[in-house]
Each structure stands twice: as C-alpha cells, then as structure tokens.
Amino acid sequence: MARVRGRKLIKKLKKDEFHPEDNKTHDEPTVSHVNETAGGDNSDVSPNTFFGVLDSGELDYFKKAESTLAIDTFENPDEKYQFINSVIEESKGKELKLATSQISSKLMERIIMESDETQLKTIFKAFNGFYFNLACHKYSSHVLETLLVRGAAQVEKELLTPDFDSVDEGEFVTTESLFLFLTNELQPNLRFMVSHQYASHVLRILILVLSSKTLPSTVQNNSTLRSKKSKIARKMIDIKDNDNYNKIFKTPDSFKVVLRSMLSSIYTSFTHGIPQGSGHFSEISLADVMKFREICVDKIGSPVIQLVIQVEGIFDRDRSYWHLIFKDSDEKDPKEESFVEYLLSDAVGSHFLQNVIASTRIKYVERLYRLYMKDRIPKLAKRDTTAAFVLQSLLKVLNSKEVKEIMDELVPDLSVLLNSNMDFGTEIIDASIRHDNYLRDEIIEQLMKKYYPRESSDKNILESCLQLSSSTLGNTRDDWPTAEERRKSLFLEKLIDYDDCFLNSTIDSMLNLPAERLLQMPYHGVFSHVVEHVLQVKRVAIIKRKLLLNVLCKDIVNLSCNAYGSHIVDKLWTFTAKLAMYKERIATALCADSEKVKNSVYGRQVWKNWSLELFVRKRYDWKKIVKEQELEMFPDSKPLQPKTFKRPNNNNNSDVSPSFKKSKFQKK
C-alpha cells in the first residue's frame, strides 16, 4: 500500500500531536486556600505568608537544643522527655517561625519524631489554621511531612489501645480528629497542591496515610517519598528515620471517607464539576482531558497522579482518573495515540506510564499494549532511557500470551539491548522463569554471547559485565563503590543464580586474574558479594573449589578481620565441605593468629561461626561437627578416594594374589 501524502494529512497530524505547555507556573493558587471553618478569617492569606524570624538569643537557644537532640547523650528516657517538654514550652507562640526557618526546622522535625502523644497533639494544635501555608514552604513542608508520619503511628496506637484516662482528665481530642481538621483545611486547595513544588510532597504523604499504604523512607535512594535533592539534604543534616517509616499503619474508617472526598474534589476541579463515574465520562470536554494529561507529564504533578491512580480503586470501580487520561474504546484515537507516543519518548511520561500500568486493571494495560505498542516492540526497546522501562513493566503485568509475544521480539536482540540497558536482562530472566522457563536456552545463548563469547580467546565475564579494569577495585577512598558497580554486581549475581554456565564462567574468570587482583575483590564493598555468591558448594566442581581455596587461604586472617571479607570466610565453612584438609588449614591459620582475630569485631564472629574454641580445646568434637556437616549436605555421597588394599610384595615373583596362594598343606 502506498504511503498517504498530502498537506491536509500533515495538518491533521500536527493538530492531533500532544504538546504540553512548557511554561507552566506553580506560584499562586486560583482558589481560596484556607477553609473558613478551620479558624479565623484567613481566606485572604497568601500561601507564602511570612511568619517572622527569631531574634539572635532565641536562635542560639534553639540551635543548641537541636545539637543536644542530635547528639542524644541523655542518661535516661525521662531526662530526654523533660528536655523535649522544656523546648516545646519555650517554643510556644514561635512554632510557625521555627517551622519556616532553615536552621530551626530541623529541631521541629527531631522534636516531632521524639515526642509522646501529648506533645504531638500540642504541635498539631499550634499548626492548626496554617497547614496550607506550611505545606507550601520549602522547610516547613518537611516538618509537616514528619508530623503526618508520626501522627499516623499515633492514630494506629489510639485505634488499637484506646486510652480512656485522658477523657477523665479533660483531654478528649484524639489524633484522628486532629488529622480530620488538617484535611478539612487543605480540602479547598487540593488542585493547587497537586502541582506545587513543596505542597505536592505533603499531599502524597497525606494520601499514603489516609489509604493505609506503606510510608517509604526519606533517605533511601529508591524512596518515592522525596526528591533526589531532598534525600541528599536529609542525609547531610543527619536526621535518620525512626520506626514509623517503611510501615503500613491501620487507620479508622473516617480516613477512607475523607480520602474519597479528597479524590472526588481533585477530580471535579479538573473536570469543571463533572462527578466521577462511567455515566459521566462522555460529558468531560476534550480541553479538560488535555489539561489533565499535561499534569500527568509534569515533573511535579506526575507523582501525585500516579499515587491517585494507585489508590482510586479502593472506592471507584469505574476508575474515573484512568478514564480521564485514557479512553475505553477498541479503536485507536489520534489524540490518545499522540499522547501515548509522548509518554513513550519523554523521561517523565515514561516513568508515569511505567508506574500506572503496574497499579491498574490488566484489561486497561492490554488495550494500550494492543493498540499502541504491540507492532513496534523492537523499536521501543531501543529507547533505552524511556520506553524500555515501560516494556519492562509490561513483562511484569501482562498475561502469558502477551509476555511471550514481547519476549519473542526481544530475546533475539538481547545481546545488543544489554549494551544500553542492563535491566532488560534481569526482567527477561524473571519473565522466563515465571512462564515455565520460556526461551531459556535462547536467553542463555544471548547472554553468553554478550558476556562470555565462546570464540573469544580473552573472554572474561568479570571484565565484560563488571568492567573490573576501570572500576574502583583496589581504591582506598571513602567514595567507593559506585551505584553503577552495585547494579552490575547484582546483575552478575542474577546470572550466577540463573544457570551453572555463568557460575563456571565467573569462577574461571576469577582464576584467570592475578592472585593479588582476586584477593582485592573480597575487600570491596560490592565485588565481595560476587565472590561470596560463587561459593556454592553443591554447584562448583571439586577441582575448582580447590583452586579458589588455594588463593583465598593466602590471606585468610586479614579477610576474617574485614567487614566484607569476614562474610566470605563464614561462607568457606560450608564451601570446604568434604575438603577436610582445607578446612583444617583455615582453622589452623586463624588459631595461629588468634589474638588478631579475637581483637576484631568481625574476627570474633568468624571465630564463633567456625567453632574454633572446640578446634583448640576438643579437636575430636570439632571433627565430629565437620563430619555431621558433610553428612547433612551430602547424605548419599561416597568418599572422594575409595580405600585400597595393600599391594602385594613384588619380591615374591608371583602374579598370583596372596589370597589365592596355595597352602603348604595343599596337594601339589
């Protein structure tokens, strides 16, 4: 069929193209942002309200208080409680100044994390009426996030173990009701918070708390809670998460009601009052759909919409937010096609699509795959910074038939795809395992072709996968290892677990290294895990076990006293099974330098794991433990060298076995 040409067609295609606005502003709200019922006439207050600054004396006091809490040298919990109480008492009337100050906001976060129920409620009440202002501020937004997480833990505590004594004392306000005051105050400005640089983070935490989802860490690299800059800053100021993070808290039914109201409010703010539900989808204007799609690819608003799509199924069976973005028809839509193409080629858009398809119904994902991605899988796979991640997500969520279709397209070019995206290898291996080892042999062939080609004379999987020669191996600086080395190391460990050929290739590559170079690996924070991972006694041949042990035994004492190497020495306890000579050689070397080993915190653990006290004092009992280990690991094994009979004496000049020699009483 000839290609369709013409100016009208080009004009139509340009009209259907998705072009998000580049100069979007996130400065001022377009609606009243403080609920009048939250206290006072605050409807005309700007979200960037200035609450004043502390004088020099107050600033010095609060800086010293922050340092005291950071050092945490209190003799007992009661002393710490009294100190926090005195700081809270001193800060009365100055809470808003403290929260919006770059220096003293750290103090507020520490106090919130260390406070008890009464102190926490005091802070909630101090912020009442100004939650929206605090959410929109660079520093106080972090304080508010910490307050929400700590408050979630307190709500669960009140729910599971209600305290009736506080009612008798006149204190009857629960943390649940304080949360409801907060959400009521933020309700009129939820649309603005979605795309605000700081308030969006507060909104995400609030949605996670109300929906009883896991509250992620604020400092981990893979945390979805804060931006990269925020996580780095949090590490620099040395505020560690307490036990309230990386947990799911039970919440009352009122939280679900509030969350439903919040999601409905956000939805109607984007659709000009049209309510949720499949019966109203046709009433939404195209302009509103396009505006919402722009929020989906906005670097600030996109994470919020991802989270909303993740939790909307709790209340809305029609998935109104999903259908505000994507259609439900079986036919292609030009504008939707343009939008999906933008998602597949944009960094923010591909991240959005990757996450939402992992949290919605499979039939919606299948529709997008069938209409817009199925016919061009190889081309999309080459977009290694965008669409490639979407394909990896599809491999996880689609049904078996579609996954096999994708694998049929990707596996023949896997060795090439790995050049730019190592994660493809991991996802394809996992997909193969989930679907009865589909294309297993072809995958292994492609991986070997990439990392250990048979025809190459200088093949080395450590070099091809880990780039060992240009790595930080052997460096003594504090900034190693790198994140990239960690990724490569984890991938090689994945290959080792996948098939024995990768295990043997890794061991062969290690043995081809100079002994000094190989002995550097156990001291490396990342590559030591690779060495530890190959020490699998049941999968490695005896001869290769001996060759590895010959190298590792050269520096066994120093290894046992090292943070990383000690794990390898522990692993050698099982790796030397049925190799009693090597086991005794290691034990003897450690005992010969027992003072050095016992003076090291890591060495003491090795000493304990190897039962070296028994080796020194009761050698027979130690050998009994060794024998029991061998029988447990190899119950059906035979001795490595079968017992042989004594050879007959050659001086007899006879070819007959001694057992068959004639007796002197036998007849000749």
Curated annotation (Swiss-Prot):
Pumilio repeats lie at residues 90-125, 126-161, 185-220, 285-327, 335-370, 372-408, 513-550, 551-588. Coiled coil: none annotated. Pfam families: PUF_NOP9. GO terms for biological process: endonucleolytic cleavage in 5'-ETS of tricistronic rRNA transcript (SSU-rRNA, 5.8S rRNA, LSU-rRNA); endonucleolytic cleavage in ITS1 to separate SSU-rRNA from 5.8S rRNA and LSU-rRNA from tricistronic rRNA transcript (SSU-rRNA, 5.8S rRNA, LSU-rRNA); endonucleolytic cleavage to generate mature 5'-end of SSU-rRNA from (SSU-rRNA, 5.8S rRNA, LSU-rRNA); ribosomal small subunit export from nucleus. InterPro entries: ARM-like, ARM-type_fold, NOP9, Pumilio_RNA-bd_rpt. GO terms for cellular component: 90S preribosome; nucleolus; preribosome, small subunit precursor. Residues 14-30 have a biased composition (Basic and acidic residues). It is found in: Nucleus, Nucleolus. It comes from the Eukaryota. Residues 1-13 have a biased composition (Basic residues). GO terms for molecular function: RNA binding. The keyword Cell division does not apply. RNA-binding nucleolar protein required for pre-rRNA processing. Involved in production of 18S rRNA and assembly of small ribosomal subunit. This is Nucleolar protein 9.
